[in-house]
Amino acid sequence: MTRRDRTVALAAMALLVVIVGAMVALPPPADTTAAPATPVPTPAPRIFRDGVVGSISTLDPLFARTRPELDIDALVFSGLTRLGPDGTVVPDLASSWSASSDGRTWTFRLRPGAAWQDGIPVTAQDVVFTVQATQAADYRGPLAGAWQGVTAQAVDRLDVRFTLATPVADFPLAARSPILPAHLLADVPGANLGGTSFELAPVGAGPYRLVRLDATGAVLERMSDAAPSPAAPSVGPDPLLWQLPDDIQQIDVRVYPDDAALAAAFQAGQVDAAGGLSPDLTNQLSALPGARLVRYPRTVLTAVMLNLRFGHNVFQNVHVRRALLLAIDRNAIVRQQMGGLGVRADTLVPPSSWAFNAQAAGSVAYDRAAAAKELVAAGWRRSGSGWVRPGVKAPVTLELLTVDATTNPLDYAVAVQVAADWKAIGIPVRFTVLGADQAVNDKLVPGNYDAAVVDLNVGLDADLYPLLASAQAPVGGSNLSGFQSVTLDRLLEAARAYAPQSTRARRMAAVEADLAKELPILPLAYADYAYVVRNTVQGPTPRLISDPGDRYWDVLTWRLATAAGQ
C-alpha cells in the first residue's frame, strides 16, 4: 500500500467511526419520510494552463511546424508506441510488437478497443494510410522522412506488418510518429490534404481531444478512457503535505507572441507552466515563490560543422580539427550562452543516452597552448599574429556560418563565442549570417561554407549513420560535413543493426572512440529544454527528449493540487 493509499484509507476509517458513532447516539427519527434529494453540483474541471510562444495555423500532423502546433498534436494524436521512463519505449495504439531475426520485418498488433475521438475504431488500415501519405511524391511536410524506406501492409484489422529496406534496431522509436484517421482523410487527394477542415478540427486517438481553438490558443479535454502506462512514474509531492490532487481534466494551451509576453503571463498567474524561454527569463521565473524548474535533457547538439568535402582542404588534417576544438571554452558556453541550462558535449551522443560511453568518448579540455601545438603539428606556421597553412601564402581567415539572432539567438551567441575563442589563438573569423532556409539551401547542402554553428538532432537512439555515413556525403545527402571514412561507415552500420541493446552499446562505444580520434564534427553542448512550472503542478518527470512536445510523455500522471491549509 502506498503512502497515499494509507492516507485515503485512514481518512475513510475515521469517517466510518464518526458515522457509526452517530448511528448509536442518535434516537430513531420521528418521521421516516425521506427528504427530497439535494442535487450535487458537478465539480469544475481541473485545468492546466500551459504557455507557449508561437502561433497556430494548422493542427494536421502532416503540416504542423510551430511549437504550439506540435505541442497540441502531441496531446491529440498517438503513435503505435510512446516514450516510457528511463529511456524505454512502451505501447500506445499498439499493444505489442515483434521483429524478425534480422530486424527487417516488424509486426505490430493494435490495442483492442483503440478508437478515434469520434468513436470509430483504429485499424491497421489507418496505419497503412499514414505511412503512404507521408511517402507521397508531392508531400513535402515535416513527416516526410518519418517512414522513409518502410513498406506497411495490413495483415488483418488489428495487425500491421512493416518491411524495412534497411534493418534498424530503433524502429519502435520511429513508430511513435502520429497515426492519422483514414476514414476522414483517405478520400482527400494528396495535393489537398493541407486545405481541409481537419487542419483546425483534428480527430486523433490521443489522450486529449480538441474542444476549442481561437487566437488565444486551444482547449483540450481529457478522453474518458485515457490511462497512463503501467510503467509511468508515481506522482508527488508527498500527499501528507498536500490535499489529494486531481487528474488534469483539461489543458489550455495558451499562445503568446514572444518570450517577454509569456514571461509576463507566468508572473501574473495566467499560466501554470512556461517552456522554451531564454535562459535569463527561465532563471528569473524559476526563482519566483511557488515556482520550480524542470530540466529535460535533449538530443539536440549544438556543434561546429566543418566542411570536409574533397577539394576543401582547410580542415582535412585532424590536428587542425583538434586545435579548433581545444580552443573553444565549452564550459563557458554552457555557463554564459545557455545560462547553465545545459551540459558540455564531448561526443555526438547525448550524455543522458543509453548509448553514451564516457570512456570511449574521451574529453578534450579547453587549452589554447595545446591548440597552438596541434596547429604546428599540422604544418601551420606563425605569421605575425596569425597562421599560414602549408602551400598558402596568405594568413588563414575562416568563414563561420550562423543563422541570425532573431531566428536562433542561442546559435548566434554561441557563434560569437566560438569566433572570439578562435581569434584568441590567432585565427580570425569572417561571419556569414543568414536566415535558416538560406543557410541550409545555399550554404550547407551544396557545401559552400568553411565552418558553421548548427543544431543537430541526433535522436533518442543516437543513430549517427545519416549524419556521417559516406553514402550520405554527396550533395543533397544528410551528411552535410562531407566526411568520409570506410572505418566509420563499418562501425555506424554495425551500431544501428538489429541486436540486443548490450551488443549495440559495445558497438556504439566503438563509434564514439573513432569519433574522438577523427573529430569530423566539433561537439559543443546540449541545451536542456527548461520548463518552469508552479508547485501546484505535480508530476512532470525529466527524461531524455527529442522534441519539446515529448515533455508530455507522462502527462496522464500529472496532477493539480493546492498546499494544505490554503
Each model region followed by its residue ranges:
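Alpha-helical secondary-structure segments
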Residues: 49, 123-130, 161-163, 206-207, ...
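Extracellular/periplasmic solute-recognition and catalytic clefts
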Residues: 134, 211-221, 252-312, 335, ...
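Ligand-site clamp/hinge motif
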Residues: 196, 228-284, 414-415, 428-430
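Surface-exposed binding/hinge segments that line
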Residues: 109, 142-188, 207-212
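Gly/Pro-rich hinge or "lid" segments in bacterial periplasmic/extracellular proteins
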Residues: 176-252, 260, 368-373, 560-566
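N-terminal lobe/hinge region of extracytoplasmic solute-binding protein
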Residues: 51-101, 132, 203
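Ligand/substrate-recognition segments at binding pockets and active sites
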Residues: 381-458
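Detector for C-terminal structural segments
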Residues: 15-28, 302, 327-359, 367, ...
